Structure formats: structure tokens, C-alpha cells
Amino acid sequence: DDNFKPGLACTPDQQNGTWIMQAHEWGKYVGKAEFKLENGQLTLLNYKLLPVNLYVDKQHPDGTTSSVLANEYITPNPQLNAFLAEYQEKGAKQIEGKIGYVNARLEGDRNKVRYQQTNLARVIIQAQMNSTDADFGIMSGGGVRDSIAAGEVSYKDILKAQPFQNRVAYIDIAGEDLWQYLEVVTRFPPDSGAYMQYHKLSFEHKNNTLVKVLINGQALDKSKTYRMSINNFNASGGDGYPALTTAKGFVVTDETDSNALKRFFAEHSPIDAAQFAPK
């Protein structure tokens, strides 16, 4: 929830009797849940998010705003810092340094990828299409986690945009089945993680009914077979996408989404962002 502020009440999601909890993102909070187990019955008593050296905007009486800590500063443990320093250095060497270049910003901000098509999503999908030799590709907008600034691009930049290490997958799907699949996924609304990003695909609804689908500019032929790239999270039903994992023609590759994007930058830089602008 973009409107959540430290100290506000929050309730985790529950699905099929199982509590599902996530302490927001990027280590900003630690989630604390208190349960009672009595006579085999588990009850959630309390749940809250504890800010970790998180700065928030504070409005002053004179109308100005300043950035202040949401709670008392938590001093890092020096012994633990010293222990982790070696691993931090090793990790930094692996993810820093130029792997490619882009001539303009690639948009991946949350308030964009969940509402509209963006150039970064299209670059990500193109990378996965290249990896699988697909005709077109899709992914949920919630899977894009950060933008990539114009200029030199590092593996760190890519991992910030694609941090989940999902596997690149694809399905060879009959046109008739593809139409039925698209009838579902093209309806996911903006302002949700499920909102579909797509590339080399266009479609049209009329009276809330899917009436037109183009793949690479050509009308979908229900008698043909198409190859669609998708990550294994969405293919497994993530974000409410119809599950494809047991369908005929479905394949999960060994390549992660971040590695596919890294390889795309390495092989195709300098990248012209305008070529991936939504139309």
C-alpha cells in the first residue's frame, strides 16, 4: 500500500487459512507477528511493521517539509558489520562495473509500471523473448521493481529492477487457447501488481469483450501455434495469472530474468530507449 505510514495499523493477507506476510521492501521494516497457539488453533494476536532507520517526510507549521527518522536510530552492530564487510566487498565486485549503456531513462517506477506500458518492461520482455525465441511476451507490472537511469548500466542496476531471480519460461500455445488466456490477463486493472506489461502484442476490447489481437502486427490466427515468453512466477499463477505449468508445450529454462536482461544489455548496447517506447 503506497499510502502506508510508520505507526499505522496493518493486517496481513490470509489465503486458505495461511497468513501471508511481507515487511514492505528493501529492508525498510521488520515485521513482528504475535500468535497464540491453543488447542491446535492458531490465532494472530498482533502484527505490525517496525521501521529500520527509515526516514519520512515531516510537515512543519510553516508549511515546509523535512526528512526525519520514523523512530529512534538503530546503531549497527560493529562486530556484525566487520563480519559482513568481506562478503559485501565480494558482492560489490560482482555487481558493479559497466555491462551496457542506454541513452535515456528506462521507466520502472511502481506508480508507472502498474498503470501503463513502459519502455523498461518492454526491454525486459524483449530479453526474455530473445532467450526463448518467442513471438511475443508478457509479465505482470509488479515484477518490475525499479527504473534504470540513462547512461552506463551495471549488474546492480539490473538486479534492482529484477531482484526476484524468477526463471525465464515459455509456452508453445495454440491460437484458440491463447485467445482464451488473453481474455483473462488483458483484463487485469491498472493499480495492481497483476497489470499486464506486454511486447509485440496488441489487443482491443469492445463492450468488455476481447475482439482483436495482433501478434507482431498480424491478426491472431486461432489455427496457428505461438510461442509466448513469461516468467515462472506468472506461469505458476502468481498475481492471479492462469497457471500454465501443467499445460502442453510449457518449458521453464535455466536462465533467470536478471541474467537474461544482463545478457541483453551486454549484447545489444548501446540501447536506444526510443525503440521500446510504448505506442
Language model features by range: what are they?
Residues 1-94, 189-197, 202-206:
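Active-site-adjacent helix-turn-beta-strand microarchitecture at beta-sheet edges
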